[in-house]
Amino acid sequence: MVDRFYEDKVLDFAMEFVVHKDHTVEFLGYSVFQTGESGAYGYNYVESQEELLRRIDVDAALLHRLIAYHKEHLAQTAYHGPVGIDMLKTADGSIHPCLEINFRMNMGILALLLHEQYGSGATVALTPVREHGFQALVEDGRLMILSEK
């Protein structure tokens, strides 16, 4: 059975952080991504934070409260390194504030780094992403993973 909340999804997005060894937590930015019907990752948008916030289209005060909440809780962990917290927005504007926590380097952080390096809308091929025949391509402002299998 699929939770009704997920059936009404209109947007996948994430908050990207890094937890430092001294337990300080830095908010790196937002990422917006697409998934298929099965929920599998499709691609990230490589855009400015302003462009991503327009896509997210949620009250800024709510987003700031979520950032503070996640920073407070991440600071209490023994982990240090990159973290992405996946969220979703529903048709009525509700936010699911924590679908998944990725305690690792993730595609959202890579999209932030690519935007910093190349800007919005750049086309960049990155190969190989993995030893297993995958490629990454940034095209029309979207970060996509392509399988050669």
Question: Which functions belong to the PLM regions below?
Answer:
Residues 74-107:
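Conserved metal-phosphate-binding beta-hairpin within the catalytic cores
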Residues 17-71, 78, 102-129:
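ATP-dependent carboxylate/phosphate-activation module, predominantly the ATP-grasp catalytic core
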Residues 6-8, 76-78, 136:
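Sterically constrained small-residue positions within well-ordered secondary structures
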Residues 120-149:
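Peripheral (often C-terminal) accessory segments that flank ATP-dependent C-N-forming ligase machineries
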Residues 2, 87, 101, 144-149:
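Short beta-strand element of the conserved SAM-dependent methyltransferase core
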Residues 1-39, 88-97:
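Phosphate-binding site of ATP-dependent enzymes
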